[in-house]
UniProtKB/Swiss-Prot annotation:
Manganese is among the record's keywords: yes
Protein name: D-fructose 1,6-bisphosphatase class 2/sedoheptulose 1,7-bisphosphatase
Top-tier EC class: hydrolase
Function per UniProt: Catalyzes the hydrolysis of fructose 1,6-bisphosphate (Fru 1,6-P2) and sedoheptulose 1,7-bisphosphate (Sed 1,7-P2) to fructose 6-phosphate and sedoheptulose 7-phosphate, respectively.
Binding-site list for Mn(2+) 1: D33, E57
Cofactor: Mn(2+)
Annotated keywords: Calvin cycle, Carbohydrate metabolism, Hydrolase, Manganese, Metal-binding
GO biological process, one term: fructose 1,6-bisphosphate metabolic process
Positions of Mn(2+) 2 binding: D97, E100, E225
Amino acid sequence: MDNKLGLEIIEVVEQAAIAAARWMGKGDNKTADQVAVEAMREKLNQIPMRGRIVIGEGTRDEAPMLYIGEEVGICTRPDAEQFCRVEELVEIDIAVDPCEGTNLVAKGQNGSMAVLAISEKGGLLHAPDIYMQKLAAPPQAKGKVHLDYPPEKNLQIIAESLDREVSDLTVVVMDRKRHVDLIRQIREAGARVKLITDGDISAALSAGFNGTGIHALMGIGAAPEGVISAAALRCLGAHFQGRLIYDPEVVQAGTYLPPVEETRRQLKEQGIEDPDKVWECEELASGKEVLFAATGITDGDLMRGVRFFGGGARTETLVISSQSRTVRFVDTIHMKDGQQPRSLQLR
């Protein structure tokens, strides 16, 4: 992929975050999501690339913007060969979550981000819109912990990898009825639990960095977000595993899920022969080149949220590349057209 693309996708997540942040604390999660989607789509279509949404806002019939299978980018036009360079015509798979944690934005709570991951065609698993059991852990524990291990064993491994006690660890778990037993096991092992209502991509990311105070993510969340998390943690060299969960009795989400056998059949039709397989992050995000970007909408462990001032806004963005093996934190001041801010604060 073109190195220039890494700079251009920064603007994609920045604009989505700014749009959503205008609705922070207003109690309207649907509008926050809608404006983020619209801003992200508009920016994607200004980039000289040939992109295809593989994880997005639903199917074509369910979502007018950024639906699965939608083509984005200038080079998707029929006459693209006339003005796009050869490298810009290479097909790219894109996974997006324009407003991860819409409820967090609506309530003015921490942990919401605008997120995007890209790879060459076939480089990201086309995860179905079901659930996934997830395990994220620091790079020091990569390949040592496992989804099939009980929480107590994984916590002991993580503690030893980080040269600390289990009681020093904090594990993020989504606050769901299905996690009652998991939470009990973590606490009985001696670790602390941080419950979140939404936003497990942010939590998985935090587990991949030292100094966030988060040492693992455990539990069941959405499968598409699992692929995006895997893309980020693969670039970081951290640990991520996922297993698709499709049994309504396990999920306990209160939303409709098809009968188990029907889902198993659909997964096989999509090429997933073993629906109970434990996926490594290198399988979920298998591309030779993987790029991840996220801009904070509200404050989080890694990035501050969007801050507005007279004449503009300020954003913090995280960009991780498997190709260049870089992690960049980008602090950007956005000035409104025709307006000059009275002052620019250094921090």
